[in-house]
A protein has these predicted regions:
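Extracellular polysaccharide-degrading/modifying enzymes targeting complex plant/algal/animal polysaccharides
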Residues: 1-68, 77, 93-100, 124-237
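Extended hydrophobic/aromatic segments used for targeting, binding, or gating
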Residues: 78, 82-122, 284, 288-294, ...
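Short "repeat-start/strand-capping" segments in structured domains, especially the N-termini
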Residues: 57-61, 78-84, 114-117, 237-240, ...
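Short, recurring structural edge motifs at helix starts
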Residues: 48-51, 105-108, 156-158, 227-231, ...
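Leucine-rich solenoid repeat scaffolds
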Residues: 357, 361-402
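Short glycine/acidic-rich loop motifs that flank beta-strands on beta-rich extracellular proteins
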Residues: 49-51, 71-76, 93-105, 127-133, ...
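Low-complexity, polar/charged sequence tracts that form flexible coils or short amphipathic helices
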Residues: 44-45, 53-59, 66-69, 76-79, ...
Length: 402
């Protein structure tokens, strides 16, 4: 994956014979270019449509479906219950000359309930994450009265659909620490006064009334912006991702944040360009929500290799990195994520890190095999600012052979 496309720093393009062009550069051609590399040119990078759109659906199943090209997003899920994908292939057609299956994510859930099951599927050549499953934070713009809030989608690629329904349960978190200030109390939606696009609202703004009295501090600001975000915890699915393969992806393999049980098992990941499994919870950039409470990553195989990444500082096999306003995390007594088990996996490491984790309680790394595919890769564990060498122990221990 590289941002150094053929037109970076180009000053002139000259048309030649036999479908050839000569590109003139200001200084030198991009360093990442090598003979045999293939570049694709897209006339539009706008994600203006989805290959398949499931909205407020229930018990949706896709089996034995082959997808070879989707113009924008892939399969998009919003506010739906129980969605299943089995024996599906999201890959370019072999020997077709085409190298892209979608210009964005493969399977993307922005709010789901019940369960999402993805098994025996193959993903390749998506221009974004093959699987991205999350809720959506709406920002608390205004506490209208003791029961009513004005909420808003913030990211410019979110909006235009209802986020809340009567009876849904909602929790509030601070944007600076992703912490609850009321013991993660849940508030029940009593009335949807107006959805995005209704009653004079723009496509991102909604007004919601709750049964319970709302805390006065929901009006607080931080850095001149609203301090709190709201998450619809009713739309947090149980997730199973099993027996899938991932390859030729310029971003991550799996993103998943939900408070329900998550099992990621028996999958094979071939050389993702960024973090292979990325676990976030984000109150400032994409507003993709979900504190993890029970996740098992087991019996998977990871191949981690340098393939020319230029956009991320870190690209470990598993990267647990919440995103807050200001970049700070709560103290160890109140972590953002809890109970993540990494067991029985095999890692083939050519570069980077097996696991990089921030703000997690009860992180278990057990019975995994790590193979060094590059003799320059070092083996060790870093805990806060203290690095533990192979064979040493503080609260953790690492041993290496070969």
């Amino acid at each position: 994956y590289t941002n150094q496309g053929p037109f970076q720093n180009a000053i002139k393009i000259e048309k030649l014979e036999n479908n050839q062009v000569r590109v003139h550069y200001a200084v030198t051609r991009p360093a990442m270019q090598e003979k045999g590399m293939v570049f694709e040119l897209a006339s539009s990078a706008v994600r203006e449509t989805a290959g398949a759109f499931t909205w407020e659906g229930k018990n949706v199943r896709a089996e034995k479906v082959n997808v070879h090209f989707m113009h924008g997003f892939g399969w998009l899920i919003q506010m739906s219950e129980n969605v299943y994908y089995k024996d599906c292939n999201l890959m370019p057609r072999e020997n077709s000359g085409h190298l892209t299956v979608s210009y964005a994510d493969g399977i993307h859930a922005s709010g789901a309930s019940g369960e999402i099951v993805i098994e025996n599927c193959n993903f390749a050549n998506t221009h974004d994450d093959p699987i991205n499953l999350h809720g959506t934070f709406t920002r608390v713009e205004k506490r209208i009265d003791s029961h009513t809030l004005e909420l808003k989608y913030i990211h410019n690629q979110q909006g235009g659909f209802p986020q809340y329904h009567v009876g849904d349960k909602v929790q509030f978190f601070t944007r600076d620490l992703l912490s609850s200030t009321d013991g993660e109390k849940q508030y029940e939606v009593a009335e949807v006064i107006s959805n995005p696009g209704e009653n004079g609202n723009d496509l991102r703004t909604m007004k919601i009334k709750f049964k319970e009295d709302l805390p006065e501090n929901l009006s607080d600001k931080i850095g001149g912006q609203p301090k709190y975000v709201a998450e619809n915890v009713t739309y947090a699915p149980k997730v199973t991702i099993r027996n899938c393969t991932f390859r030729n992806v310029p971003t991550r393999g799996i993103l998943c944040t939900t408070r329900k049980e998550v099992i990621i098992e028996n999958n094979v990941f071939h050389n993702m360009s960024m973090a292979t499994i990325f676990l976030s919870n984000d109150s400032n950039d994409w507003y993709e929500s979900g504190p993890i409470r029970d996740m098992k990553i087991r019996n998977n195989t990871f191949y981690i290799k340098d393939i020319g990444r230029t956009s991320w500082e870190y690209a470990p096999a598993i990267y647990i990195h919440p995103v807050t306003k200001g970049g700070q995390f709560p103290d160890a007594s109140n972590p953002i994520h809890k109970n993540i088990s990494i067991e029985g996996n095999t890692f083939y490491m050519d570069e980077d890190t097996v696991v990089k984790a921030e703000s997690v309680e009860n992180l278990t790394f057990k019975n995994n095999k790590v193979f060094r595919m590059n003799p320059d890769v070092t083996v060790g564990i870093a805990l806060d600012n203290k690095t533990i060498q192979a064979g040493q122990s503080v609260q953790l221990k690492t041993d290496a052979k070969g």
